[in-house]
Amino acid sequence: MTIKTLALQCRDAAQVVSQLSAPAKHALLDAMAAALEADAAAILAANARDLEAARAKGTGSAMLDRLALDDKRLAGIAAALREVAQLPDPVGRITREDVRPNGIRVQKVRVPLGVIAMIYEARPNVTADAAALCIKAGNGVILRGGSEAIHSNTAIARALQRALREANVPDAALTLVEDLRRETMLELLQLNDIVDLAIPRGGEGLIRFVAEHARVPVIKHYKGVCHLFVDASAEMELALRLLIDGKATRPSACNSLETLLVHAGIAERFLPLAAQALRERKVELRGDAATQAVLPDIAAASDDDYAAEFLDLILAIRVVPDLDTALAHIRQYGSDHTEVIATQDADNAERFVQSLRSAVVMVNASSRFSDGGELGLGAEIGISTTRLHSYGPMGLEALTVERFVVRGEGQVRH
């Protein structure tokens, strides 16, 4: 079956999903979560095959962490589906209502986007998260995962599709692309008369490929080169907490810290404490000359290091003379994802927030909160670094659009 045929079937199924009531979608998502739990053994066995193949190819630790499933992670995925089920349904929500002087009643109403193509790499959880969010928002979804997770994705998709069929919803509403050839993905990205939106999640190469070749509208989940700036007024203990949580808890996450910027006025006191805490957690440090003057045993940081999304236990460090230099560094090397300042200076905090255009800006809070669930959206489909209708963590509302509904009693314009 061609990718165009699959997309057409998904579009037809999306029409069915768009008509489901909020209670029906709630019940459907609960059933999808139960299906994952029922198929847990098969899903974990499939994941073990993917992990074995990935290790044989010498896949790095960050990618292996993203790929891996266990009982706890699978239970978390099922729980996330149930959380999405309980979220308020955005479809049909009236966001504006007005009666014009001529008597017509004008409403802006949220409606589903239609068909969403999700293109991602070694993250089996995205298969379930994307399906849940798209269906809750009344859409069909085409899932094109990476070859690294093909067995895991297939097992998850089969379980979710069974729940759809049992609810009398066409299982094409959740279409998994099993033909992973690049030319098939290219064809999918050309189907702008069928597919309404493409969302790539993965490495920089994948996202650039999708953005450069798509005729379908694209919202990019670009790399997360996230910074922590420790201002001269920062409380040491608070800044250390933000640093450790942001770098060492899950370095493979896109909201983990990659670069530490430290005000020169606090560097001699803060950097030794930071280095000790990070080394205890096996973090490799790389710094500029000013950092090496305080920490002489660390490697030099290159220009490429400051632009890198390591997704690993590696941190680039730079000492800066002031806030303006920190802001200039972030503008040059950042990816518009998430930036953090540790400060007790309210004016500097406000300048930091107002001067950066990143999707998420934090003041005295960990970069790891840059997540749909933590920010109150429920599960997220990605973190948009594209300034379109959605910017930052994308929850349910980002998978809908507003349209006008006008009601009258025969009014004409002329």
UniProtKB/Swiss-Prot annotation:
One cellular component term from this protein's GO annotations in UniProt: cytoplasm
Coiled coil residues, start to end: none
Pfam families attached to this UniProt entry: Aldedh
Protein's pathway: Amino-acid biosynthesis; L-proline biosynthesis; L-glutamate 5-semialdehyde from L-glutamate: step 2/2
Enzyme class: oxidoreductase
Known EC number: 1.2.1.41
Location(s) in or outside the cell: Cytoplasm
PROSITE patterns according to UniProt: PROA
Record GO biological process: L-proline biosynthetic process
InterPro entries, per the entry: Ald_DH/histidinol_DH, Ald_DH_C, Ald_DH_N, Aldehyde_DH_dom, G-glutamylP_reductase_CS, Glu-5-SA_DH, GPR_dom
Keywords, ordered alphabetically: Amino-acid biosynthesis, Cytoplasm, NADP, Oxidoreductase, Proline biosynthesis
Gene3D superfamilies named among the record's database cross-references: Aldehyde Dehydrogenase, Chain A, domain 1, Aldehyde Dehydrogenase, Chain A, domain 2
One example GO MF annotation: glutamate-5-semialdehyde dehydrogenase activity
Keyword flag Oxidoreductase: yes
Function summary: Catalyzes the NADPH-dependent reduction of L-glutamate 5-phosphate into L-glutamate 5-semialdehyde and phosphate. The product spontaneously undergoes cyclization to form 1-pyrroline-5-carboxylate.
The family this protein is said to belong to: Belongs to the gamma-glutamyl phosphate reductase family.
The protein, known as: Gamma-glutamyl phosphate reductase
